[in-house]
């Protein structure tokens, strides 16, 4: 053994070939600060070996290196710019030393090589991979850019266009694509990976492969003519601004950095990478996006913990077909849980099966499945008008019309047709679970399971615990939702649960703005372009359905009369009374026509002006800041109330529910992250300017208490001390 660290070791193989093996104590290898330091120590030893002829890098895990340790990021981002720059310089000196070894080097890459893992293998001369490879640089998705030389080496290896596509989009690619673009040099079966890598090293040692020429390309300026450079970088910048926009600075910064470094050698190019990385790491966007990643891990970890002793449902059922029922049935069958889809009429069953078939055909068109797989999946969805087979069902979700009487009747009838241990769930969006459970003999076996539309796209499932719901019931439904590829978040029962409870105060803020003379088009534009929502409130209401929102608004008002009962007729009432239900009938705040792809396209409709004039004061202009404040304060206040009342368990779960269920702008990180970024004291000052607008604008007591000391909701992060720990390595 030449060297043994906590996360890697170096040993001799044969004929002057050494292997450096990543083998961290946990289940995966991460390129954390300790591993970078250990790699430096390993290189100290290797550089002294006069008999060294070649070096093989490999992993003892199922994945090579999954990336940097993102749990370290928030503390690293607290480090002053100069110190962070020094640490990056140190880390890059380690990878440069690996790249500059006087012998050929190869990485034997299995599974994932992402982020820092990808940057590590870019520093070797050759890369041999297994068919299950996923390799790429996802940093821009976290609000940063590659910092270990990825933005320097990859363009010089692949050419500007292929590298920009991966780096700017934060993409990873599979083995075949990686081979095609030159990111790896070959693909072999896992059992032949080590021997194959040694064989390539021997060829390089013997002079059959020119490893020095291969290495030299990474040390020199990018080989592009001025015209080629202008074309590549102009197109890349245009594409990035179109897709990422102004709220995500990392992708455009990465492109501009690669462009500026194109004429430079490795050392100068790495300095530019460092100079670009450090300011990005100190942005609110990076903190928010890293926060989302960590919150996602927290939420998924919680679901895993909940379900560790639960048997996965083997057979499911959906009550109520149609678009929603068909979407749920498709998702369950697609992920391997057969499903019975029951309805009371053939038309709905046909609609449900058509929806499932349409979604499967899209997978076929994208090349994700073949015809055999399609027919196999569709055959596991059993449409029926009867309860036959319900005695074999482990879990049932009811997805009938949002009417408590109908839901109660369907649930009570179904309870008599299933086994005593079968779990029942309701896909209600607003009706309290306790109310629906009142007709059941086994309320402990019942909970809410709120999917979001369209089911196949929206990652969130709210799992709602009723007063009598058992832990086992929650665990079974969480297990099924997880199996379906969804992110389940458990919330406690109340009208609207969590997501709709906080959405309708947001809509109420919108209604008040319109009542006071705001133009709905401007409100939408500000909330989309300035705050960053994927849809403004008017457009969102049209998509949800004005009739659906009108009904839900009444349910919420009955549930929370003090805050959500209004004493005026609003825009939603006016459109509902005029039978303008949104996209579903082509008329809402906008008029909708199908485009060439059959998708609804919004157009201005002057007829809506007279309807809104009846419920609004004369039009007046509002500043962007006032629109954002009046829209967001009611939502944020309600989010905080949900935490204080125990409806949602943590800021992390609240923020993920908002991002995954409503499309809360990820670069803000969720309501609590936005609140922390703003500062609780500053938020209180802002909210107090609008408290005359009513109870929705009154800040909850818990938030007022935090504001006195400007306390955050997320625990404060201490700056890391990586430089002092590593610079002598």
Swiss-Prot record:
The record marks 119, 139 as: Important for catalytic activity. Substrate binds at residues 296, 500, 660. The active site is at residue 450. The keyword Isomerase applies. Coiled coil: none annotated. Signal peptide: none annotated. Pathway: Lipid metabolism; fatty acid beta-oxidation. GO terms for molecular function: 3-hydroxybutyryl-CoA epimerase activity; delta(3)-delta(2)-enoyl-CoA isomerase activity; enoyl-CoA hydratase activity; long-chain-3-hydroxyacyl-CoA dehydrogenase activity; NAD+ binding. NAD(+) binds at residues 324, 343, 400-402, 407, 429, 453. One of its GO terms (biological process) is fatty acid beta-oxidation. Pfam families: 3HCDH (PF00725), 3HCDH_N (PF02737), ECH_1 (PF00378). Keywords: Fatty acid metabolism, Isomerase, Lipid degradation, Lipid metabolism, Lyase, Multifunctional enzyme, NAD, Oxidoreductase. Its EC number is 4.2.1.17, 5.1.2.3, 5.3.3.8, 1.1.1.35. Residues 708-729 are annotated as: Disordered. It catalyses: a (3S)-3-hydroxyacyl-CoA + NAD(+) = a 3-oxoacyl-CoA + NADH + H(+); a (3S)-3-hydroxyacyl-CoA = a (2E)-enoyl-CoA + H2O; a 4-saturated-(3S)-3-hydroxyacyl-CoA = a (3E)-enoyl-CoA + H2O; (3S)-3-hydroxybutanoyl-CoA = (3R)-3-hydroxybutanoyl-CoA. GO terms for cellular component: fatty acid beta-oxidation multienzyme complex. The keyword Membrane does not apply. Residues 311-729 are annotated as: 3-hydroxyacyl-CoA dehydrogenase. In the N-terminal section; belongs to the enoyl-CoA hydratase/isomerase family. In the C-terminal section; belongs to the 3-hydroxyacyl-CoA dehydrogenase family. Involved in the aerobic and anaerobic degradation of long-chain fatty acids via beta-oxidation cycle. Catalyzes the formation of 3-oxoacyl-CoA from enoyl-CoA via L-3-hydroxyacyl-CoA. It can also use D-3-hydroxyacyl-CoA and cis-3-enoyl-CoA as substrate. PANTHER family: TRIFUNCTIONAL ENZYME SUBUNIT ALPHA, TRIFUNCTIONAL ENZYME SUBUNIT ALPHA, MITOCHONDRIAL. Heterotetramer of two alpha chains (FadB) and two beta chains (FadA). This is Fatty acid oxidation complex subunit alpha. The lineage of its organism: Bacteria, Pseudomonadati, Pseudomonadota, Gammaproteobacteria, Enterobacterales. The gene is fadB.
